[in-house]
Amino acid sequence: MANTVLRIGIVGCGYAARVHLGRLSALDRVLVVGCADPDRGAAESFAAQASASSASTSPVAAFTDHRDLIKQCGADALAIFTPHLSHYRPAMDGLQADCHLFIEKPLSTNVQEAADIVGLARGRNRKVGVGHQYRLLPSLVEARRRLSAGTIGPLRLVTATLAQGWLATHGGAENSWRFDPKVAGGGILADAGDHLLDALLWSTGQVAVETAAVQHRLESGLDVVTAAVVRLAGGTPVTLAISGVSPGQLFEIIFFGERGRLRATDHSLLEELGDLPAQAVPLAEGGPSIDENFVAAVLDGSPLCCPADEALDTVRLLEAIARSAATGQAVRLA
């Protein structure tokens, strides 16, 4: 685009928005022009914080309705950090107003809404980036490169695990929405597990075509444990394990090929070839943040870290896993 500064409106003024604000405020080519949250106090507090960190002398405007933000602030882009079930309406309204979008993951919690966003963005020629920042991890970037190069031979099996004390560590009033399926659209699967699903699909370069799953749910319907088997388009089977009631933090994907295997975590990559001992793979330094990636994509035309059409594949798998667990039947995606 011709502008040298990206005018961004923030929709949803909770914890995630404040984290992203810290990174956006450090970028010379960004101006936060307004914010919206149904909680007026949250919107005004965020606006004050954004104004204090801005180089502009104009205060950041606060609204309780994202439509007023769109109408009054002249934003080039919206960054959406609402609870998951509330992504759709501001995304569609923003696209209708010719705004580019950054949407915190997941793109949506159901395939139809995600497809609507992708279709409208394509029709309006707008960029939509989704917050799957695990794609920027040096360990996964290098694993993807080695898989594409065939370093471990044909891929025969993948195991993917995410375990954390999600239920215990996301307490407090501000994060209480995460534990209400009617607001969040699900539990650990959609809230953190989708990072694992997206990393799996992105690193292998394949989409999922079939899955069968079981879940443990609380009385409220909140899923806290998911186990699934997935078949990728190339025929490779995958086992998935996601727990939100386990202490510590584990993110691990193991890729088994005919000539060796790769073990990727969020901070390391091990490679084993043949019968040789495992070797730590040297990793590059981390690159731009996902926020910087989005700004560069809009202003310079560089590639998005996670464009919406790719995030749609993750939503398809997320929805299929949830449906399989609910029905007790395998679900085909294609």
Language-model features, listed with the residues they occupy:
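Basic phosphate/pyrophosphate-binding loop/patch that engages nucleotide-derived ligands
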Residues: 119-127, 141-157, 233, 257
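Predominantly a Rossmann-like dinucleotide-binding segment in NAD(P)-dependent oxidoreductases
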Residues: 134-212, 328
